[in-house]
């Protein structure tokens, strides 16, 4: 096993264990059983989410997209497929729209069942920015995800569809790690994904606990969510390690889909969710710049 493969396997195991760790913290600590949390709790999650947004922004613009464009242009030139159509950018757009359409399908499905359930899954926001009724994930500013969910609506089908959507996000995130060809890039993207996933799984676990979901279901949801990024890493490793004539082109296309997913996560989830809030805007921008600057420095030094 070469060193790069060892690094990817280490990232796979580390991402799995740390995601499980952050997901199970709320289930074990009484502090998180208090509905609504504290202002300090919300502020810390919000600042960490902004930092993660900066990390993702830097990884997108300075590393993932440039490397993908270089790889895909090289593969297209080998096969004389460069006919003037912006195919590389189109592939990225496909990754972006795949995640967007998936999420909207899930939300439409839950909306279609709204009248059949006692409690709605998507809690409408009040004018002051807070939802009436049961708390939603949106109440935690640092959740890192913009899907506003009321887990007290205990339809097993709707809960499964929601976590399926989040889990597919994670598969594409892990895919970006598995497709990398250098140790530094694997570690850089792994850090970004780890910060992002930890915030999401932590916040979702808090709301599951506060909504009196059975402990067994909390464990199941957290475990399924945790294994999705490692699954994506494994798929990427298989693609890289499989020697076939079209392997380079397949790898480049998957890199483009993963890049589109990163664009979606950064620009439609983390940044709007945090920066649209009027609370502590300058501090949020500061944490955003810190995350971006650290990853930019790593790119420069690497």
Swiss-Prot record:
PANTHER family: ZINC TRANSPORTER ZIP2, ZINC/IRON TRANSPORTER
Extracellular side: 1-6, 66-86, 180-185, 241-247
GO BP term (any one): zinc ion transmembrane transport
Sequence similarity: Belongs to the ZIP transporter (TC 2.A.5) family.
Lineage: superkingdom: Eukaryota
GO molecular function, one term: zinc ion binding
Major localisation: membrane
Any one annotated GO CC term: endoplasmic reticulum membrane
Subcellular localization, as worded in the UniProt entry: Cell membrane; Endoplasmic reticulum membrane
Keywords linked to the UniProt accession: Cell membrane, Endoplasmic reticulum, Ion transport, Membrane, Transmembrane, Transmembrane helix, Transport, Zinc, Zinc transport
Tissue occurrence: Ubiquitous. Highest levels in ovary, high levels in heart, eye, kidney and brain, moderate levels in intestine and low levels in gill and skin.
Membrane-protein topology: Multi-pass membrane protein
Transmembrane region(s): 7-27, 45-65, 87-107, 159-179, 186-206, 220-240, 248-268, 282-302
UniProt source species: Danio rerio
Function field: Transporter for the divalent cation Zn(2+). Mediates the influx of Zn(2+) into cells from extracellular space.
The protein's name in its UniProt record: Zinc transporter ZIP1
């Amino acid at each position: 096993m070469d060193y790069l493969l060892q690094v990817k396997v280490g990232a796979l195991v580390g991402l799995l264990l740390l995601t499980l760790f952050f997901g199970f913290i709320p289930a074990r600590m009484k502090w998180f059983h208090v509905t609504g949390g504290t202002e300090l709790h919300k502020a810390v999650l919000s600042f960490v989410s902004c930092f993660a947004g900066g990390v993702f922004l830097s990884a997108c613009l300075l590393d993932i997209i440039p490397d993908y464009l270089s790889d895909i242009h090289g593969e297209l030139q080998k096969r004389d497929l460069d006919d003037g159509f912006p195919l590389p950018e189109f592939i990225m757009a496909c990754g972006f729209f795949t995640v967007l359409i998936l999420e909207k399908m899930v939300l439409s499905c839950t909306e279609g069942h709204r009248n059949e359930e006692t409690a709605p899954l998507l809690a409408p926001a009040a004018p002051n920015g807070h939802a009436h009724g049961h708390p939603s994930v949106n109440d935690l500013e640092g959740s890192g995800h913009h899907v506003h969910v009321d887990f007290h609506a205990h339809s097993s089908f709707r809960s499964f569809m929601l976590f399926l959507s989040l889990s597919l996000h994670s598969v594409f995130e892990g895919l970006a790690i598995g497709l990398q060809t250098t140790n530094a890039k694997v570690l850089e993207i792994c850090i970004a994904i780890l910060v992002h996933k930890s915030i999401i799984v932590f916040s979702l676990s808090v709301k599951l606990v506060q909504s009196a979901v059975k402990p067994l279901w909390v464990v199941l949801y957290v475990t399924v969510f945790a294994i999705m990024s490692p699954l994506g890493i494994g798929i990427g490793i298989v693609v890289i390690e499989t020697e076939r004539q079209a392997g380079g082109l397949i790898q480049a296309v998957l890199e483009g889909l993963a890049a589109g997913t990163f664009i979606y996560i950064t620009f439609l989830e983390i940044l709007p969710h945090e920066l649209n809030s009027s609370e502590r805007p300058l501090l949020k921008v500061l944490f955003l710049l810190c995350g971006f600057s650290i990853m930019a420095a790593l790119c420069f030094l690497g």
